[in-house]
Amino acid sequence: MSSTPAYARPPQGYPLGTNIYFRICSKIVIPILKALTKRDWRGTEYLPQSGAVIVACNHMSYADPLVWAHYLYANGRAPRFLGKESVFRVPIIGKIISGAGQIPVHRESDRATEAVDHALNALSMGHCLGIYPEGTLTRDPDLWPMVAKTGLARLALKSRVPVIPFAQWGDQNLLPRYGKRITFWKRTKVTIVAGPPVDLSEWFEKADNHEAQVAATAKVMSAITALLAEIRGESAPAVIFDPHNSDLPRVGKFSPEKANREKRK
């Protein structure tokens, strides 16, 4: 078996980018997801069937990557996700996700930039790269997207590949934010919607400019939030939750009580 990481090799097979790790996991995970969820999938026409692409989504639950990967895999793409490095050190799980070509992120460390290089490599190979721009589960008390990090923008502006916005809603009822217990007693409706590509071309010549990265990030997050508002049938908050102005930690777990205190501010 090649020692080259799966994300650094051209994608093959169908769904594009699949390999033995994806195929084994899909045989186990997909039947479980079908038993636990009722799927409402929309916007599948916006997902390219070939070529490099960045897909970006809101983040509310540890179940998010599984249900989103199911959508992508069932519609022709085996994604390479950026995920926190600690998961890659979990016995068995770490080997599986590494073998499937997922990319570790060393958050809040001097190795964080390594993920950018690996992700650009994956895109140069023609992969579908999945990103949660917020970098962690949203801190917004009502689960709206919060102010995101600029990693997605740096990747999008340097690679100039299409960026497809996604929103998902419902799997927080399957597994609540930072929850440990899955809801088994009823099937949970999970809605995932894709939108048209976000045009970031006005910032292509400013890929290393921080203001351009912030503006590009905001445009992608606006598209994601609009899709989520459509799903929820509600208006998004006028003021976007900014974790930098919060008492909640930027990454890592926090108590529901602390989140409720934020809501009362």
Give a label for each model feature:
Residues 29, 99-106, 135-139:
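Short, basic, glycine/proline-bearing loop/turn elements
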Residues 2-21, 113-265:
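Non-catalytic C-terminal accessory region of glycerolipid acyltransferases
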Residues 27, 42, 67, 92, ...:
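Short Gly/charged-rich anion-binding patches and loops
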Residues 48-109:
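Catalytic core of membrane glycerolipid acyltransferases/transacylases, capturing the structured
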